[in-house]
């Protein structure tokens, strides 16, 4: 069933109440999702995106009930992922010559999924426009790596609607389409979950891209996303949230997550949480067992936190697998502005804590004292854990706390020193890493494909240099963490 969005714009997407997994099984969609497709009927008839491939036949049937498919003048594909463009093969079988407008990378992605290089592709770039009649145009804005290289947004003049692709969306299914019609707590919870788990690696790109769009000085009366609600009531509120989340976001909270074999590590977590609360009752402390909790909720809480405590029993001299897996995800999400520490119990060798502490440094976190406990914690050991929590609360405080609590001295493990890595020639300075795709520029090697000779330090690399992997500019590069001084 089509739903009117504004004037001659209709939603012709698909709700998916049952979906519980996204990106394989990596993202739990506990509130379902929607695949938002939009039909514009001005002098020209335009379709923006399709739906997930599993709804292809249903989508084409429903669209055929709205219009004669042969009257469709243009198809706009903002993003080629299967939950956006999945119905293209079914649709194009009916109207094979219809022009498809997308980015250059979009053609590569669409062909990679659908294998139809003969389709009528038209490449668009930022600032390009398409006249759709009645004095209205579609203006295109490339948004590479938000969150795929092919991504773009489409703005419709006259109605002032921004078709924003994945940005500002959420995996959230509701019978209502607009943001002012749904539960606000649920909505913003899902917005933050979506940002933390999907867009955080690209936070460095969010603010400049938003500022670029705002720099066009175009009014935005509505933001039509690819998933979840359409923002019609104060649509810029979600833009403001994104600017906050992209700015090394943190709240006054600490997340503790762990896995345990005999509840010994859980006892340590509980005691440390008590100690934190004694010193600073204002801080929110959340504890999660990674074997029993939704990992995306844990990751969202880590994103929100000023600090994280990670615990594991030692098993075969390493950390437990679910903790290792979550730390690998955190490394990829590249959260910033976080403090961290490891803890855990052991029997005869406490290798898990040392490995966690090293992985926390790999995540880019500022690590502080780690804590080990042998066998099952007794009263004295739990007192040490509570004191450790108190020390953490003081060290990580966002604002000074007047409250002091005396307790037994703590026996703690100092964080392992980070190994120093140097370039082949120290005078060339550190290697530089792209914060988007993690490609590394080595001054000793240069980049011959862009005429950057071996032995060229980063300061002398031309300003128009682009990352060979993701085509982003110099501004997204940072010194390789192990070489930063």
UniProtKB/Swiss-Prot annotation:
It comes from the Bacteria. Fe cation 1 binds at residues 79, 81, 147, 166. Its cofactor is Fe cation; FMN. Residues 30-210 are annotated as: Zinc metallo-hydrolase. One of its GO terms (molecular function) is nitric oxide reductase activity. Fe cation 2 binds at residues 83, 166, 227. It is found in: Cytoplasm. Keywords: Cytoplasm, Electron transport, Flavoprotein, FMN, Iron, Metal-binding, Oxidoreductase, Transport. InterPro entries: Anaer_NO_rdtase_flvorubredoxin (IPR023957), Flavodoxin/NO_synth (IPR008254), Flavoprotein-like_sf (IPR029039), Metallo-B-lactamas (IPR001279), ODP_dom (IPR045761), RibonucZ/Hydroxyglut_hydro (IPR036866), Rubredoxin-like_dom (IPR024934), Rubredoxin-O_OxRdtase (IPR016440). HAMAP family: NorV. PANTHER family: ANAEROBIC NITRIC OXIDE REDUCTASE FLAVORUBREDOXIN. Anaerobic nitric oxide reductase; uses NADH to detoxify nitric oxide (NO), protecting several 4Fe-4S NO-sensitive enzymes. Has at least 2 reductase partners, only one of which (NorW, flavorubredoxin reductase) has been identified. NO probably binds to the di-iron center; electrons enter from the NorW at rubredoxin and are transferred sequentially to the FMN center and the di-iron center. Also able to function as an aerobic oxygen reductase. This is Anaerobic nitric oxide reductase flavorubredoxin. The gene is norV.
């Amino acid at each position: 069933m089509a739903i009117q969005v504004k004037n001659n714009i209709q939603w012709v997407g698909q709700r998916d109440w049952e979906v519980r997994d996204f990106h394989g099984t990596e993202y739990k969609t506990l509130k379902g999702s929607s695949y938002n497709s939009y039909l514009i009927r001005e002098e020209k008839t335009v379709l923006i995106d399709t739906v997930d491939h599993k709804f292809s036949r249903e989508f084409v049937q429903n669209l055929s009930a709205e219009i004669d498919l042969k009257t469709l003048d243009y198809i706009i594909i903002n993003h080629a992922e299967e939950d956006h463009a999945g119905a293209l093969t079914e649709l194009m079988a009916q109207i094979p010559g219809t022009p498809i407008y997308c980015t250059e990378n979009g053609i590569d992605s669409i062909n990679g999924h659908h294998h139809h290089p003969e389709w009528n592709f038209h490449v668009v770039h930022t600032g390009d426009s398409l006249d759709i009649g009645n004095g209205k145009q579609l203006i295109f804005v490339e948004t590479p790596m938000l969150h795929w290289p092919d991504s773009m947004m489409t703005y419709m003049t006259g109605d002032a609607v921004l078709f924003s692709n994945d940005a500002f969306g959420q995996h959230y299914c509701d019978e209502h389409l607009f943001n002012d019609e749904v539960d606000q707590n649920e909505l913003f919870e899902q917005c933050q979950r979506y940002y933390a788990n999907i867009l955080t690696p690209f936070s460095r790109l969010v603010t400049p891209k938003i500022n670029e769009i705002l720099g066009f000085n175009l009014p935005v009366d509505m933001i039509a996303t690819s998933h979840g609600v359409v923002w019609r009531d104060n649509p810029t509120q979600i833009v403001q949230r994104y600017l906050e989340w992209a700015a090394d976001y943190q709240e006054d909270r600490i997340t503790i997550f762990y896995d345990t074999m005999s509840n010994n590590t859980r006892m340590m977590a509980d005691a440390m949480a008590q100690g934190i609360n004694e010193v600073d009752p204002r801080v929110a402390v959340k504890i999660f067992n990674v074997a029993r909790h939704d990992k995306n909720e844990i990751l969202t809480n880590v994103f929100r936190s000023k600090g994280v405590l990670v615990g594991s029993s030692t098993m075969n001299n390493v950390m437990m697998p679910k903790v290792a897996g979550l730390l690998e995800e955190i490394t990829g999400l590249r959260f910033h502005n976080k403090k961290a520490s490891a803890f855990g119990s052991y029997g005869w060798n406490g290798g898990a804590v040392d490995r966690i502490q090293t992985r926390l440094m790999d995540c880019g976190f500022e690590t502080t004292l780690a804590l080990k406990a042998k066998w099952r914690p007794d009263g004295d050991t739990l007192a040490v854990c509570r004191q450790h929590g108190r020390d953490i609360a003081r060290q990580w405080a966002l604002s000074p706390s007047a409250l002091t609590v005396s307790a037994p001295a703590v026996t703690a493990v100092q964080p392992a020193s980070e190994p120093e890595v140097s370039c082949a020639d120290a005078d060339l300075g550190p290697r530089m890493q792209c914060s988007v795709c993690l490609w590394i520029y080595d001054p000793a090697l240069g980049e011959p494909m862009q005429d950057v000779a071996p032995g060229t330090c980063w300061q002398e690399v031309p300003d128009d240099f682009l990352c060979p992997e993701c085509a982003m500019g110099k501004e997204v590069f940072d010194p390789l963490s192990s070489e930063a001084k």
